Design a protein with these regions (language model features):
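P/S/T/G-enriched low-complexity
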Residues: 2-4, 10, 32-445
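Short, strongly hydrophobic transmembrane alpha-helices
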Residues: 21-35
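N-terminal signal-anchor/signal peptide hydrophobic helix marking the start
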Residues: 10-22
Length: 445
């Protein structure tokens, strides 16, 4: 009888259906529950991504807090903002699902990092018949944002009489032509330099070659430097990621030769966020005046004293540039590379001194002192123009002419050097050097 029951095929469909209905319903229920869990996971990941990214954007609370920190650390404002963003991204239908969120927002070496981890426990519906009462959904989203480099530029501009030379070969030719007859009984004929004579009482000599240049439309080198600095302020304003990223101060070697003798820099502009105001101030960048020809034996170009002066102007630490409170200090030095100063000891000229007067390529020891402080030194070398028909040039400059550019490059922080010839544009060169500086990788250790 048992054998007949086993071999009997009638009613098998009903029996098999009864046997399979529970696993079939369980499988279908599992698919539905897992589908809901997958939907929840997708939504929570999207919320975590939004929170991780949104909490460290340039205008986020975390970025604002990081901007005030001179060092590294946790950004509590970023954590609060990330939490708000996360829960604002979840839908109401998921509101009954308990979700825990762990958030970390940190600043380290100028990089803001956020980590948003979530863990949710979703109750099941159909899977409960199989003994599974909940599904755990978890995940982590991370994001990073490198803050812009905050920089303070201290522009040190050589405005000494040698910067009164014609800006281009054509300007030099025009200047020589304009001075072909010389002055004061034929002295200083065919002069390429526009000396600016203003007496110690402030009375300007209208016949000085500075005014000859002006009256004949001759552009001198300091004019081009001043125009380049003004244009650079517009470029810097367009380049910065935020209004506070760059500050600029500008100095010349002195308004007068008397200032230079006293080692007193002329401050064109205080260190300022307002780059437009700095641009306006560039109108005060003029050729240094001298009270008379051969005043102080023409010893107005002391790179040593100018670099010492700018070193004194730069207060506090050199900075890493990671925040507004940790701004990187940069000297932007523009000069033609030939010093002419009273330096009876330590002159590097191969000809030595002449009665205490030292004409030499730049002595880089004061550049090194700035670099030893951690201050970056950017050098724009406005190539010294050879004047083969000038006795002073042939006697005192030509012996070290081949070293001028090399010494200027030695003064600069590696990679922060640019040379511009008389036929090149100083404005373009200054902009190129600036962009090179602001795009350089930030060293964090």
């Amino acid at each position: 009888m048992l054998r007949r029951f086993i071999l009997d095929r009638s009613g098998n469909f009903g029996i098999m259906t009864a046997l399979l209905v529970v696993p079939l319903l369980g499988a279908a229920g599992t698919a539905i529950d897992f589908g809901s869990a997958l939907s929840l996971r997708t939504e929570l990941y999207a919320a975590a991504d939004a929170a991780a990214v949104g909490s460290i954007t340039p205008k986020s609370d975390a970025a604002t807090q990081a901007n005030t920190m001179s060092g590294d650390g946790s950004l509590t404002l970023g954590k609060s903002e990330a939490q708000k963003i996360f829960f604002s991204q979840t839908s109401k239908k998921q509101g009954d699902v308990p979700v825990t969120v762990d958030i970390s927002v940190q600043k380290k070496a100028g990089i803001l990092s956020s980590t948003v981890s979530f863990n949710a426990t979703m109750p099941t519906t159909f899977m409960q018949v199989m003994g599974f009462h909940q599904i755990t959904v978890s995940g982590t989203a991370t994001a990073q944002y490198e803050t812009p480099s905050y920089m303070d530029f201290f522009m040190l501009l050589d405005n000494t009489p040698s910067m009164g030379v014609g800006a281009t070969p054509d300007d030099i030719t025009a200047m020589k032509k304009a001075t072909a007859n010389g002055h004061d009984k034929g002295k200083d004929k065919n002069c390429a330099f526009a000396c600016h004579i203003v007496s110690e009482k402030g009375v300007e000599d209208k016949n000085s070659y500075y005014n000859v240049a002006r009256n004949n439309g001759v552009t001198i080198r300091i004019d081009v430097v001043a125009a380049a600095v003004k244009a650079l302020m517009a470029k810097a304003k367009d380049t910065q990621s935020m209004a506070s990223q760059f500050r600029v101060a500008a100095y010349t070697f002195g308004k007068t030769a008397q200032d230079a003798k006293a080692a007193k820099l002329f401050k064109v502009s205080d260190l300022d966020y307002n780059l437009g105001a700095v641009a306006v101030a560039t109108d005060m960048i003029n050729l240094m005046s001298i009270p008379s020809q051969n005043y102080y034996n023409d010893q107005q170009t002391s790179f040593d004293e100018a670099l010492k002066g700018i070193d004194t102007e730069i207060k506090g630490n050199a900075g890493m540039g990671t925040s507004n409170a940790d701004r990187q200090k940069i000297v932007f030095f523009v000069a033609d590379g030939v010093a002419d100063s009273y330096k009876p000891a330590g002159c590097t000229s191969p000809k030595g001194v002449n009665g205490g007067r030292c004409i030499e390529p730049i002595d880089t020891s004061n550049c090194q002192k700035l670099k030893d402080r951690g201050i970056k030194v950017a050098v724009l070398y406005t190539t010294y123009l050879p004047l083969p028909d000038n006795d002073f040039y042939n006697d005192w400059v030509k012996p070290f002419e081949t070293k001028i550019a090399a010494k200027m490059e030695e003064c600069a922080t590696p990679g922060f050097y640019f040379a511009v010839s008389p036929t090149d544009g100083i404005e373009e060169a200054m902009e190129a050097l600036f962009l090179k500086i602001v795009s350089a990788p930030r060293i964090t250790s």
